């Protein structure tokens, strides 16, 4: 993937860039692998906003991605197309299996139209092949990693993401995640070889607010710039700091929301570096 930069012909074009989509081989999705995707506008079933800054955007269809691949062990598949998916940053690959089945997978880097991929313990170590961690050599770069055997890929699925298999000991494999965290994962869990493609995605400059609106992202307005009727931080004479611990528009305290005693925390060997410890 490359990035095409625009000339500053208008204020919105100044500094903006777009993917060149050179790797895309098909513009319409496989009809049997898409489902309707109605928009919620960030509202729940009673109409209350539960997620702010969502609404509008272009219509989309959801592409059904195969995050498991267990049922196709030993069945060869040809990469028929590399496609754009509006629901994720990564590209997706359409596989035609020799038994006639069609499936979508996350497209890894260097996977091309016409390549063959396979799943199963005896598959070769090459991009796009899916194997249990116990059958992958230490040091291999992988993506689309399961957290529980048979649970489907959960980690390293976005553009440019990858995980490194750093060790295997007993029934656990140690993985270095993109955040720097090292975590134990059951060796029966499966992963796909290679890193996710479209790594240049993070370098795209959207250029103007309108392009974000096309994606369904609405403006983020600070609470301190609102009126008291709109937000607990609103109001005051002149500029204020809000005068209290940060809260959401409903008055609920904001900040760290991750459970500190999550069950899977016991599998973390080394925590990710945060704040001043990032260096």
From Swiss-Prot:
Region (Disordered): 1-20, 25-59, 222-279
One Pfam entry name: Ribosomal_L2_C
SUPFAM superfamilies linked: Nucleic acid-binding proteins, Translation proteins SH3-like domain
SMART domains: Ribosomal_L2, Ribosomal_L2_C
Subunit structure: Part of the 50S ribosomal subunit. Forms a bridge to the 30S subunit in the 70S ribosome.
Family: Belongs to the universal ribosomal protein uL2 family.
Protein name as catalogued: Large ribosomal subunit protein uL2
Species per Swiss-Prot/TrEMBL record: Renibacterium salmoninarum (strain ATCC 33209 / DSM 20767 / JCM 11484 / NBRC 15589 / NCIMB 2235)
Upper lineage: Bacteria, Bacillati, Actinomycetota, Actinomycetes, Micrococcales
Name of the coding gene: rplB
